[in-house]
């Protein structure tokens, strides 16, 4: 990310133009784009990035937060893309049949049988519906993916 882009984004947050993003400016910005962030999370963001301890973020401190946000967005997009590969019918869920089909097409030993796939899904199926939704998929991928589930 170049300095010009960072500066433009920073100015969108820095409403009073004092060169710092205060807690209320951060909160107001998120609110203006329809994202409700709890007060404690706003405080955590500022505390984490506020290197000089003045209770606000200057452009350099903001740069770290912005980079983190961009990386999280990219990770989310990658996860959605991977989820779409497994969710073959596009209904928002990965079934045992879809899992078996994708794992077989990848030439993986894991999940050769429907029963294996059901077991793998049951390890991440938080809501107990027998399928993996996107939220469950993200948790699973952060834990090593479907391959990690087949080991026990």
UniProtKB/Swiss-Prot annotation:
GO terms for biological process: double fertilization forming a zygote and endosperm. Ca(2+) 1 binds at residues 14, 16, 18, 20, 25. GO terms for cellular component: cytoplasm. It comes from the Eukaryota. InterPro entries: EF-hand-dom_pair (IPR011992), EF_Hand_1_Ca_BS (IPR018247), EF_hand_dom (IPR002048), EF_hand_pair_protein_CML-like (IPR039647). Keywords: Calcium, Metal-binding, Repeat. Potential calcium sensor that is required for pollen tube attraction for ovule fertilization. Belongs to the calmodulin family. PANTHER family: EF-HAND CALCIUM-BINDING DOMAIN CONTAINING PROTEIN. This is Calmodulin-like protein 2. It comes from Arabidopsis thaliana. The gene is CML2.
